[in-house]
Amino acid sequence: MVLEMNTKENVLNHLKEYGFVVIPNYWSPEKCKQALNELKTLPNQVFEGGQGGDLRCQHSNKYLSSSNEFLNDSFIQNIADDYSLCNIADRVVAGIVNYNSDLQTDSGGGWHVDSELPAQLKSFMYLTDVNEENGPFMFVQKSRDLVNELQKHSNLRISQELVNEHVNSEDIIEMVAPAGTCILADSTYLHRGKQIESGTRYTYTTYFYEG
């Protein structure tokens, strides 16, 4: 579901109906390049390994002005305030997913939900172009009720077998989009980062929690 970013009401309505919204051209290509150059200055020691084998700087907003700007984005904050009680922008995680032919790597460690709260917003910024092969964000629309019926294992993960059995393929949205695309998603819905097959994916992700 792709929207123009200028209508808060439309964004909220689609978020509530489908669980996600894709906002194109939220940042310019130049702004993304600046953010990417900033991100690449971070020392290795500020990164940790994610569950899917990706690299994550948990509080990149403390180091990078572009990340801090994304954390304090007023439009996204207004959406968060109206969407759920999880409206405190806690941190921006700078994420890097690198292809390695010897490893199976993704962001998130397979299908999962972030919590079992009634609703919880997360915002993503693609800093580079994301295609079918370099680990796009994947999301199961309208899956909130379904999630409650599925067995979960370590850290609210849901097996691929259960997804294959219970999820209609047309409800799985693979978010291929250029740099500058902003994605708002309810992380209590089923989602994952696709396993990377080539290249590198760079993103910012803002995590929202209850106050």
What is each PLM-predicted segment?
Residues 112-116, 127-136, 143-144:
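Active-site region of the double-stranded beta-helix
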Residues 125, 199-211:
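A short hydrophobic beta-strand segment most commonly corresponding to one strand
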